[in-house]
Curated annotation (Swiss-Prot):
Highest taxon, organism lineage: Eukaryota
Entry protein name: Light-independent protochlorophyllide reductase subunit N
Principal location: plastid
Molecular function terms from GO: 4 iron, 4 sulfur cluster binding; ATP binding; metal ion binding; oxidoreductase activity, acting on iron-sulfur proteins as donors; oxidoreductase activity, acting on the CH-CH group of donors, iron-sulfur protein as acceptor
GO biological process: light-independent chlorophyll biosynthetic process; photosynthesis, dark reaction
Record-stated family: Belongs to the BchN/ChlN family.
Species name: Angiopteris evecta
């Protein structure tokens, strides 16, 4: 095992086994409460959604499949008329504020012009239609959310300063926004408007809002908002900051298309990351942070039992959901040794602050820098794991059982995608997930169950 004094990046050519990005529907349809997601694909896409989301059809979830048939692929059917018919049916049954069309691999292959059809159908049915190509051509399944948010970004209203406007113009501009967000959007105190982007549960969003409010920073809005009608206003005077590492496309769209100012901060995962995230936002607004060091120390003290279990243990990230760098940095701060950070895709510009914090954390903890492997080859990873014998492997579901059979403790990386991992108070939930397989093995050892017995053939 080579040890590195600086971060080293490698790139392999491996095929990674991960979910399809259309799985983003699972959490986005719950986050945007007045939305409806229409996935346009084949029966394979439908089977995947039915199995992965685990929602029975009689539950009437706010998503559906538009299954392509031979007539669609051979251009015998009119795509515009078929999609219009489905959207009218959705409008009649659910009447959402927005319909999101999710393109798939098949719509890419047959060159279905969803972007051209959507404006016509939108005009005819009177409901906004957002097109997002969340297909399997992306690197990781979490990038499905990135694609959807980048598409929704174009639908956010334009930010305009209302102070210098005439009365008539002011009323016209204000009417674009919802009653609930109007005052917060236009009357930000002592600092420019701040919009946070990334889909997190409402409780987590409230916690992050509260942490910033302690520093006299008020969040103008979230992308996505809980309701499509409450999207935040965007423009040159608006600052934006991400909460998830896989939203590089959204960040680029916010900067280039909407002219927002991006705050490049580490991500609020773990007490150290949350403190660095808040400090960076404060520094941009010229605000001196108050009580952050004490707040972080208090959280670390509350995590003492978990830290005692993790200290000195080793972990290997195979790469699955683009949360790997942030989680690795947090676990290194907890005293763990990270042998390798496999990651399907690395945007070094968007994650620059996170990579810098990772490097500083390794130096602070006197731990060798982990190697970062982009697009890792799974076969090569297995060979390296056989040599290193880590105490824990954080991996995709496809590799978990084979690794367990070879005596390596595993944790599904997808669990971190759906768990509440952001902010100070949720650090315990992250460590609860990480330590569960280690605690399970400790319990089995006390029972004397140390060997796997092969079944006897009679």
């Amino acid at each position: 095992m080579n040890t590195f004094e600086i971060l080293t990046f490698e790139c392999e050519t491996g095929n990674y086994h991960t979910f399809c990005p259309i799985s983003c529907v699972a959490w986005l349809y719950q986050k945007i409460e007045d939305s409806f997601f229409l996935v346009i694909g084949t029966k394979t896409c439908g089977y995947f959604l039915q199995n992965a989301l685990g929602v029975m059809i009689f539950a009437e979830p706010r998503y559906a499949m538009a299954e392509l048939e031979e007539g669609d692929i051979s251009a015998q059917l009119n795509d515009h008329e078929e999609l219009k018919r489905l959207c009218l049916h959705i409008k009649k049954d659910r009447n959402p504020s927005v319909i999101v069309w999710i393109g798939t691999c098949t719509t890419e292959i047959i060159k279905m012009d969803l972007e051209g059809i959507a404006p016509k159908v939108e005009t005819e049915i009177g409901i906004p239609i957002v097109v997002a190509r969340a297909n399997g051509l992306d690197y990781a399944f979490t990038q499905g959310e990135d694609t959807v948010l980048a598409a929704i970004t174009h639908r956010c209203p334009e930010y305009k300063s209302w102070v210098d406007e005439e009365d008539g113009t002011e009323k016209k501009v204000l009417s674009v926004y919802s009653e609930r967000n109007r005052d917060e959007t236009f009357k930000s105190p002592n600092h420019p408007p701040l919009v946070l982007f990334g889909s997190v549960p409402s409780t987590v969003a409230s916690q992050l809002d509260s942490e910033l409010k302690r520093q006299s920073i008020r969040v103008s809005g979230w992308l996505p908002a809980q309701r499509y009608t409450e999207l935040p206003s965007l423009g040159e005077e608006v600052y934006v900051c991400g909460v998830n590492p896989f939203l590089s496309r959204t960040a680029t769209t916010l900067m280039r298309r909407r002219k927002c100012k991006l705050i490049g901060a580490p991500f609020p995962i773990g007490p150290d990351g949350t403190r660095a995230w808040i400090e960076k936002i404060c520094s941009v607004f010229g605000i001196k942070p108050q009580g952050l060091e004490e707040r972080e120390t208090q959280i670390w003290n509350n995590l003492k039992d978990y830290l005692d279990l993790l200290r000195g243990k080793s972990v290997f990230f195979m790469g699955d959901n683009l949360l790997e760098v942030s989680l690795a940095r947090f676990l290194i701060r907890c005293g763990m040794i990270v042998y390798e950070i496999g990651i399907p895709y690395m945007d070094k510009r968007y994650q620059a602050a996170e990579l810098s914090l990772l490097q500083d954390t390794c130096k602070k903890m006197h731990i060798p820098m982990p190697r970062i492997v982009e697009k890792p080859d799974n076969y090569n990873q297995i060979q390296r794991m056989r040599e290193l014998q880590p105490d824990l492997a954080i991996t995709g579901m496809a590799h978990a059982n084979p690794l367990e059979a070879r005596g390596i403790n595993t944790k599904w990386s997808v669990e971190f995608t759906f768990a509440q991992i952001h902010g100070f108070t949720n650090a315990k939930d992250v460590l609860e997930l990480v330590t569960r397989p280690l605690r399970r093995n400790n319990s089995l050892e006390h029972l004397g169950w140390t060997n796997l017995l092969q079944p006897t053939i009679i």
